[in-house]
């Protein structure tokens, strides 16, 4: 089981089996890469490695659900869904995964749930685990966008600075595509910039 008192009835092996059954081969490979990077970052920064592994394995567990099914999950669990349906559709899967963790899979640790929820957007006052999962998703081994190698090097030296640059890239990408920007991403960048100037 995941470390004592972390609010989970699910082991890392169980999480791995669960997501393998729910995801395409390509998405599953990405998930395993995120897990490896998350554990590496957790070791580097002294975070709980098992929590990092579990959050990473579950972060995209709802990614391939139809939008209608995610909306139904939110409607059925309005209190814990945190108005997710009002957010841009590309971020729904993090909230849907968090709801499923709580209602079906026995994962209730607030740190793990938070990291799953905000892995696409970031948010204000991100915890160390939030930052690790966000960065692990951005820099997992199969990613090959311009600047990813620089982020991989930077995140091992200064996580806050890497987060700042990753959020800037993410915002630029969303704007370039003409998609709506989640307000949590702007708040996360403001926080990250403040942390880098302290």
Where on the chain are the PLM-derived regions?
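Charged phosphate-binding loop/patch that engages nucleotide di/tri-phosphates or the phosphate backbone
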Residues: 172-198
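Long, amphipathic alpha-helical surface segments
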Residues: 159, 163-177
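Divalent metal-dependent catalytic cores for phosphoryl transfer on phosphate-bearing substrates
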Residues: 14-21, 39, 44-165
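N-terminal glycine-rich anion-binding loops that anchor highly charged ligand groups
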Residues: 30
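Short, Lys/Arg-enriched N-terminal segments with co-localized hydrophobic residues
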Residues: 1-9
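Generic secondary-structure signature for well-ordered alpha-helical cores
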Residues: 24, 43, 121, 172-179
């Amino acid at each position: 089981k995941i470390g004592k008192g972390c609010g989970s009835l699910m082991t890392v092996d169980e999480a791995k089996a669960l997501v393998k059954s729910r995801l395409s081969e390509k998405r599953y490979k990405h998930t395993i890469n995120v897990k490896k990077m998350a554990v590496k970052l957790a070791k580097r920064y002294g975070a709980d490695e098992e929590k990092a592994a579990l959050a990473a394995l579950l972060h995209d567990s709802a990614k391939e659900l139809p939008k209608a099914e995610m909306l139904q999950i939110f409607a059925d669990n309005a209190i814990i869904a945190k108005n997710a349906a009002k957010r841009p559709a590309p971020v729904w899967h993090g909230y849907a995964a968090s709801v499923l963790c709580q209602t079906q899979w026995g994962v209730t640790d607030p740190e793990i749930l938070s990291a799953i929820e905000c892995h696409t957007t970031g948010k204000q006052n991100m915890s160390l685990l939030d930052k690790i999962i966000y960065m692990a998703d951005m820099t997992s081994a199969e990613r090959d966008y311009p600047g990813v190698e620089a982020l991989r090097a930077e995140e091992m030296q200064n996580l806050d600075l890497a987060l700042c640059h990753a959020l800037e890239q993410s915002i630029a990408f969303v704007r370039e595509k003409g998609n709506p920007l989640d307000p949590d991403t702007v708040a996360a960048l403001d926080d990250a910039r403040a942390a880098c100037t302290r």
